[in-house]
Amino acid sequence: MSSNINDFVIRFANVNGSGSASANGMFAKALFRMGIPVATRNIFPSNIQGLPTWFEVRVSEKGYLGRREGVDIMVAMNAETFAEDIDSILPGGYLLYDNSKPLAKEFLRQDIHEIGIPIATMLLPEFADPKQRSLFKNITYLGALAALLNIEFDVITGMVSTQYKGKDALIEPNIRAL
């Protein structure tokens, strides 16, 4: 018998201006729409495009809103902060990253679980434009998280439709990238 544990911290490490805010927000909203209490935090040193940015979601069945030390799941999408991001993962936690290129040995930790998703490789045949591939990688990791965490896919696709309502040309490719 499996049981769901709705008490964890997930942090998204991204590059500011990469379109990650939309995907990360959809992740939190999807959990909330499923009736799971969440608290979100943006952590960024600057609003300058290209600099690091983090988005943290605390999932707490008891409704705790404050931050707590450590990260249970790290979605590491920023090469510049990769080492720091891995260091913040609690023992027994998870690292989700794009394994289209092999993970360097200096980033390996024996006390965490690595989940490599070949995001860039998957997007290459789907989207010819490099800028599109860069933007859709965020939606692709959202789809991977939905599968890993048993988030209802209909909730995620509904979030995409809501997010891009009135911009119908964006809905289909975003759902395809999931």
Predicted regions located by residue number:
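Active-site cofactor/cluster-binding pocket
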Residues: 1-178
